[in-house]
Every structure is written in structure tokens, then in C-alpha cells.
């Protein structure tokens, strides 16, 4: 990322981080997700969902559908639109950003939180718990399968080896729990 772009991207990232905090998503602390993973491993009521290559999968189109036009305009102004390949050719990007961009982490958190909240509202979940930290998503088990479908429809791939809906094991933000016991390697 060009240095000047990065400066503006970080500014957008900070604004997104503040907006997320107002919604109860604290990107400076992973312990909420870790605690919910613990509870999910004990009670079985919460699922932990992880995505493959999430940072490289947030498309321009999903952002256009979810974000206000002024936010989208600001992000498009400071994002890298092309990548130069080793052979010297350039390739147009259809994703909003990649890791290394100053707002990717905050934006992917917002997108996954919005989709998870929408699913919980759509199916009228009894347990409306939604916790998101990057691509580490926690929702009630009743919402998990529908959320996985919605994520797939939006172009995201679930990491099946790190997604736990059933059984006594849960993992989120680097912590692994089996029946309430920390089994983090």
C-alpha cells in the first residue's frame, strides 16, 4: 500500500473501530470472543465460525450493498485498485482491500457483524448473541447454519476445520476449549 493511502486508510479504520465499539464490538480486546467460545463449549448454545482468506474476499459489491454511499466513496478513493504482478503486468482488484490496507480488519469485522445480526433478526433467534473479531464469528447454534449459507452467498468460504457448531469443542481468537477446559496448544 502506498504510504499516503495508508495514512488515510488508517483514519477510516479508526472511524470504523469507534462505530463498532458503539455497537459493542471492541477490536482492542479478544477476550469477549474467547469467553463466549468457552461458554459455547460448555453449554453448546454458541457456534464459532471461521472463514478462509476472509481479508481477501470482501468484494466491492458487498460493501456497496452494506455501506452508506459516502463511506463507500471515501474507501474507494484511498484503496489500491490494481496490483502489479511479478511479470510487470497489472491486475484490477475486485475486492475492497487486502491485509496491509489500513481499514481491512475493521471493515471485515463490520461486514461479518452486519451479516450475522441480519441472520439473527431474519430467523428471530431466541439467543441474539453476536460477537465478531475479524473473521472470528460467534452466533447462537440456531443461527449458525443459516449464517454459513449467507456468508457463502456473499462470496465467503467457511474454514470447516476451524468452525464448530456441534459437539463440545469451540475455538475463537486463538483459544481452544473442550467442555469448558482450555486445550489451547
Residue ranges of predicted features:
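Core nucleotidyl-transferase/polymerase catalytic module
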Residues: 1-185
Amino acid at each position: 500500500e502506498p504510504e499516503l493511502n495508508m495514512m488515510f486508510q488508517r483514519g477510516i479504520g479508526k472511524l470504523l473501530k469507534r462505530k463498532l465499539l458503539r455497537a459493542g464490538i471492541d477490536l482492542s480486546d479478544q477476550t469477549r470472543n474467547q469467553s463466549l467460545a468457552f461458554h459455547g463449549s460448555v453449554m453448546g448454545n454458541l457456534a464459532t465460525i471461521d472463514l478462509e482468506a476472509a481479508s481477501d474476499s470482501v468484494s466491492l459489491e458487498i460493501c456497496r450493498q452494506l455501506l452508506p454511499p459516502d463511506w463507500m466513496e471515501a474507501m474507494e478513493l484511498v484503496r489500491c485498485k490494481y496490483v502489479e504482478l511479478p511479470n510487470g503486468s497489472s491486475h484490477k482488484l475486485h475486492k475492497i482491500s487486502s491485509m496491509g490496507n489500513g481499514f481491512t480488519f475493521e471493515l471485515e469485522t463490520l461486514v461479518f457483524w452486519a451479516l450475522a445480526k441480519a441472520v439473527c433478526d431474519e430467523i428471530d433467534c431466541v439467543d441474539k448473541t453476536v460477537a465478531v473479531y475479524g473473521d472470528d464469528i460467534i452466533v447462537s447454534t440456531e443461527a449458525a447454519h443459516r449464517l454459513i449459507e449467507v456468508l457463502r452467498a456473499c462470496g465467503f468460504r467457511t474454514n470447516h476445520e476451524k468452525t464448530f457448531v456441534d459437539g463440545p469443542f469451540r475455538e475463537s481468537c486463538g483459544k481452544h476449549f473442550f467442555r469448558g477446559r482450555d486445550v489451547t496448544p
